[in-house]
Amino acid sequence: MTEFEKTYQNYNPRQAALDEARALLTAAAKAAMADGALPEAELPAFIVEIPADVKNGDIASNIAMAGARSWRKAPRMIADALLAHLPAMENSVFAKVEVAGPGFINLFLSQSFWASVVLGACANREYGRTDHGKGAKYNVEFVSANPTGPMHMGNARGGALGDCLAAVLDWSGYDVTREFYINDAGNQIQKFGKSLAVRYLQKYCGEETFPLPAECYQGGDIKVLAGEFADINGDKYVAACSGLSEEALFESEAFAQLKDALVAYALPKNIAALKRDLSKYRIDYDVWFHESTLHESGAVMAVVDKLLELGACYKAEDGAIMYRSAQYAAKYGTVNKKKTEDGTEEEAKDEVLVRANGIPTYFAADIAYHYNKLATRGFAKAIDVWGADHHGHVARMKGAMDAIGLHGEDLDVVLMQMVNLMRDGQPVRMSKRTGNAITLTDLLEEVPIDSARFLFNMHDAGSGIDFDLDQAVKTDNDNPVYYVQYAHARICSILKKMESEGVQFAGAEKVDATLLTEPSEMDLIRMLAAFPQEIVMAAEKYDPSRINRFVIDLASAFHRFYGNCRIQGADPAVQQARLALCIGVKNAIFNVLTMFKINVPEKM
């Protein structure tokens, strides 16, 4: 890396300009007060922002309006005083500063600033990456599907959302761990084993002899796993389970042994299938955390003991250990509600952490798991991506972190709305291939992975998605990911064509990018300037979808630029500047697509 290229490492021009504007206005206010032009007062809280209309400057501030009360002057008079006391701007990124309307201060960036944006985007292959997060350790846990069955469309969306969120955090300078929590303990696994065992017995004795209880898993995948187990082990478990009433069967040692054997066979297969499908979906986890390890290590009961010691729990008359949930959850919102005997709902107050029989609840394990993230492993933030149907669990989990001596604010939950699959404008609920509900496996057989990852990340988590299967397989501009990939391929084609005609790019350090002043050039440069800060904002707001929308707009701006500004046959100096701009846009698009693990074709 050359010294010139090092200049643009962690380059965030928009934020740098905003910071300089704030520093200039702060210095002007202090100078005006020292000079007597403004009365001595505490500096007001004020805003510096990017105005919607560039006619109102590249950056605007309300400092004069914000200071009207403390400085006891009209905003326009304050603004004039501030302008008169601005520091010398010879080395500033600003070309001029104006007062507008009742006292807005508008700052206009210099052409040399815009030129530096072009050169930075061109010279820095990782343009968009910053050190904003200063290496803070963040854990992003997402998907975490129950290993009792195949993954569904919610998992498909959660996978794209969680992985892309981890990516923007990484590009914003955070030390990110991607994590999957494997629910391999508790009631779900008991139900899984029971479902498998009944299906196994049905294979030899029929469904009338061993009917499947309504609370069991009804999916065809359970039949398949039970059948495979039977093919390997034969009927050796059948005799011991025969001739018993349903109640006696489910309480028998023979049935327990059958369940354990089936879970030992089926659970690893399901977990392997989860890993295989997620890897195909281009999701690579750093940690696969097994719930069972929390129980085996004693971590769950250690957390319960700590909560008892802190007074957040108490022992009920029947021996159960109760947690004062509402007391700690109240500051974070509504907790899950429970049904009363008359069928109405009331807010749960105290919740069971350990049942009277000594078995911990899932909630106890969940507290232990998040304690492990924040306390044992020391993450600054634990970010969970959950389905919106878990909204009632947010307050109780954040409250539990407070109760155990941590900070609920260090646990953030991204709630994700549902996905509707659409084809020909109509909802699709069943797979053509299997006749069952569409799984992630089914989706990835029908839809290109590039399309799936991009389209599932097109909307913020709080918005529902209508995923158009027809759009996802298109290879034209109706498919957003194709549109963005085509912009990259088009730039590659332009660069190759220029090379074939003997025009070599001289290098960013030799380009005079101040020559780029055409409106479509400036539109493109402004978008490039915003790119690193867009990634930071996506990370801060936990909304990677804003990067998808940004890169679509960037591709559109490039196509307009290319239609309006000649490269072939242009003045040599202008031509070099425009090539630098093309390379800068190419770098930005490349970085978005690779950040989100989407292919970046050089020709299409």
Residue ranges of model-derived segments:
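Short, charged, solvent-exposed linker or helix-capping segments at domain edges/interfaces
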Residues: 116-121
